[in-house]
Amino acid sequence: MLNQKIQNPNPDELMIEVDLCYELDPYELKLDEMIEAEPEPEMIEGLPASDALTPADRYLELFEHVQSAKIFPDSKTFPDCAPKMDPLDILIRYRKVRRHRDFDLRKFVENHFWLPEVYSSEYVSDPQNSLKEHIDQLWPVLTREPQDHIPWSSLLALPQSYIVPGGRFSETYYWDSYFTMLGLAESGREDLLKCMADNFAWMIENYGHIPNGNRTYYLSRSQPPVFALMVELFEEDGVRGARRYLDHLKMEYAFWMDGAESLIPNQAYRHVVRMPDGSLLNRYWDDRDTPRDESWLEDVETAKHSGRPPNEVYRDLRAGAASGWDYSSRWLRDTGRLASIRTTQFIPIDLNAFLFKLESAIANISALKGEKETEALFRQKASARRDAVKRYLWDDENGIYRDYDWRREQLALFSAAAIVPLYVGMANHEQADRLANAVRSRLLTPGGILASEYETGEQWDKPNGWAPLQWMAIQGFKMYGDDLLGDEIARSWLKTVNQFYLEQHKLIEKYHIADGVPREGGGGEYPLQDGFGWTNGVVRRLIGLYGEP
């Protein structure tokens, strides 16, 4: 990837100097609360909270040895293994035998750990099924039932059934689940919607936020905050009344705004940045600054080539994972080098749009419950965020939303994340019209809309298209009256997925859509995954709206 040619169709937007020299960071507010920042889970009746230690914390040098030795092709495999005995006993045994001449690390791991189950090998698709039938038959395959928690496993037990994306992802994921839920609702699976609603509310109650996924190594970060959108979906589909989730929405908001009151202009703490004019906007963050358990070796290698303190790089890699866009030119100072990642220095347009939706949802539900003061407070917060986004993230010259580099005080790259303000109703009609023109000319292809217009070798860039981006673009443009563009994206995406399904009899995580011939999407840290939860969800919903392609 480092030698790959970067195609930049808009050089004016890429005037970013490569700066790999480390400087002391006066902008980050250091508070005592950052020590041991991860919340301790509570006990609830009927389901004991899971042990929150990560595999890296628990197995120490054994964990590093296994990951460094590449015993498994995928770095996620070992963190997902479950020990056959007390981890302390395993560690003691390892320390006793590791220096023996005939020590075999692979055999040691096989003797002391249960490997993760591989579910995908159990399912064979029927080529005679239509796309709709295929998706409806996949829901049981992607469903995981609540189970007694395996002692010392990284999997966090949940009280109800849930849907997983598929492939290597054998746990539920926060923002993936919203787009999966769209399809569940269309398939009439209100039972699963109720289960997943209960699970996410349970995680907020017990961990103070919804983690990236239900693994111990995901507890230190969240993902794009879409619980307010889930609550809206629950209300629309008669699954649960929105009022019952008001406290959960407030708790999630407190997580994202933690430390805001202590900040002065040009200072940041965790997820919050106070801008030069005193307004508050948010960034992605992870409370840990170590290599990710699930991508340990990849992170170590990336940090080696960064020219920066490793812990700083690890934090930015983790924050990039929290964004859901792992990885993309959006987070890179030099779009050809993952080692130049600076996620925590960008104010993302999509994150702040989702938080606008959260603030608006709290205000709306508070109004339904007659809580006038709370309603007024959160309407003011939503209005202030909308104004700040317009000041800092709206590029009036080009008619687009862009991320904002708050450390350099300049706009960053244009990507499909720019459509999220339309999806949540934050843009005005003039902004929506101008953005539609930019999307038509810069991101739209015969196969759907591209994640970005930059070819970097990262998976959230050109030539890839992703289901959640299609859905938000379709609905966002239609909400502002541009049915023509919304319908074009919808039919293009349905054609892409159906054409690939007819040839390969499967749905996948992402698609190569740059040239009108649907192919498997590439890039990223891991092989392409089949399944696939949010692709199934979005396509099933679109079939309900547009019919089978």
Curated annotation (Swiss-Prot):
Annotated Pfam families: Trehalase
Keyword line: Cytoplasm, Glycosidase, Hydrolase
One GO BP annotation of this record: cellular hyperosmotic response
This enzyme's EC code(s): 3.2.1.28
SUPFAM superfamilies: Six-hairpin glycosidases (SSF48208)
Pathway(s): Glycan degradation; trehalose degradation; D-glucose from alpha,alpha-trehalose: step 1/1
Alphabetized HAMAP family for the sequence: Cyt_trehalase (MF_01059)
Protein task: Hydrolyzes trehalose to glucose. Could be involved, in cells returning to low osmolarity conditions, in the utilization of the accumulated cytoplasmic trehalose, which was synthesized in response to high osmolarity.
Family membership: Belongs to the glycosyl hydrolase 37 family.
Protein's UniProt name: Cytoplasmic trehalase
Natural source organism: Shigella boydii serotype 4 (strain Sb227)
